[in-house]
Amino acid sequence: MKNTKIKIIITGGGSGGHVFVGLSIAEQLIKIGCEILWIGSSDRIESYLIPKSNIKIYKINVIGFNGNNIFLKLISLIKTAYSILKIKKLIKYYKPDIVLSIGGYVSFPGAIATWISKVPLIIHEQNSVPGLSNYILYKLTNCKILQAFPNTFPRAKVVGNPIRNAILKIKTPEKRFLGRFGPLRILVIGGSQGASILNLVIPDVAKYLPNKFHIWHQSGYSEYELVKSKYEKLFHHTEYKVFDFIKDISIAYEWADLIICRSGALTVSEISSIGIAALFVPYNHKDNHQYWNAKILEKIGAAEIINQKDFTKKKLIKLLSSWDRKKSLIMSQKSKNLSITNSAKKIIKEINNLIGLVK
């Protein structure tokens, strides 16, 4: 990149998936001397995670447009319009060289303000089905579109989802599984907010399959005490750990033989980059994007899917009773073979190409 300090705005957030992708890119950009300003929500995960990473954040107050409540939709439109005006003024003052939109409804005002201001805009779509914000931006603007998975947008470049460095350092499946014996190690992850269906069903399943598993279970903050008490009532020889939130997920990933989790875009990308057998329980979003994220690994035999309505104690006991480490290793190897490496570098290359074209 050029010797002068390049200013880049990253806009988006709302969920851990969006934020961790953006942070992975931001860290690489800072290393090569770029100045980063983040535009995010005032009351979501980015509002406290971004400052912890020593990145300046400009907070806006927006709400999503989904749902059937007409009044809330109207409020969403008003807040979005107001935020567009605020960000337009910010862009005029800050003078960014380029803006990167990482998705989520909070990204929309920043991306629209960028387009109106005629500043170069790149959109990164993390899911296999585009979110509403990115779909509108794709139709409305002439911005550069990058995608994590093939066929989300026609003719868009596939770059994957950037993965945190600690996760990229995890050993290959062959090295992890070498000499591993004893009960199957199951990691249960419900996302940063937890997942009630996993918290409800899995402790009961463990009770019916004693001695077969060791379980690490991330419950989320709100149901931590409930899940912990469920496991405490199990047989004393059942090994388990319950976490409200696993701070260093790379340790948990390296430990696991099998992961049972939702199928958000970043989770699927992390699982593939490491190579872990997965049992996905997609969240029932309106556009069903988590199901289609999971389908990418399920199609190659690297994962299995149970829809939430079918995720019962009986079905899970039947599935897990015959699951062994050999099956996990084969699935892990298939998953690893699909991984996309150097995603952050690919995105930075596209940023550099676009700035070079317009300067």
Curated annotation (Swiss-Prot):
EC annotation?
Answer: 2.4.1.227
Name of protein: UDP-N-acetylglucosamine--N-acetylmuramyl-(pentapeptide) pyrophosphoryl-undecaprenol N-acetylglucosamine transferase
Keyword Isomerase on entry? no
Provide a Gene Ontology MF annotation, just one. undecaprenyldiphospho-muramoylpentapeptide beta-N-acetylglucosaminyltransferase activity
Which pathway or pathways does this protein act in?
Cell wall biogenesis; peptidoglycan biosynthesis
Against CDD domains, the record matches this protein to: GT28_MurG (cd03785)
- Supply the alphabetized keyword list: Cell cycle, Cell division, Cell membrane, Cell shape, Cell wall biogenesis/degradation, Glycosyltransferase, Membrane, Peptidoglycan synthesis, Transferase
Reactions this protein catalyses: di-trans,octa-cis-undecaprenyl diphospho-N-acetyl-alpha-D-muramoyl-L-alanyl-D-glutamyl-meso-2,6-diaminopimeloyl-D-alanyl-D-alanine + UDP-N-acetyl-alpha-D-glucosamine = di-trans,octa-cis-undecaprenyl diphospho-[N-acetyl-alpha-D-glucosaminyl-(1->4)]-N-acetyl-alpha-D-muramoyl-L-alanyl-D-glutamyl-meso-2,6-diaminopimeloyl-D-alanyl-D-alanine + UDP + H(+)
Query: According to its record, how does it sit in the membrane?
Result: Peripheral membrane protein
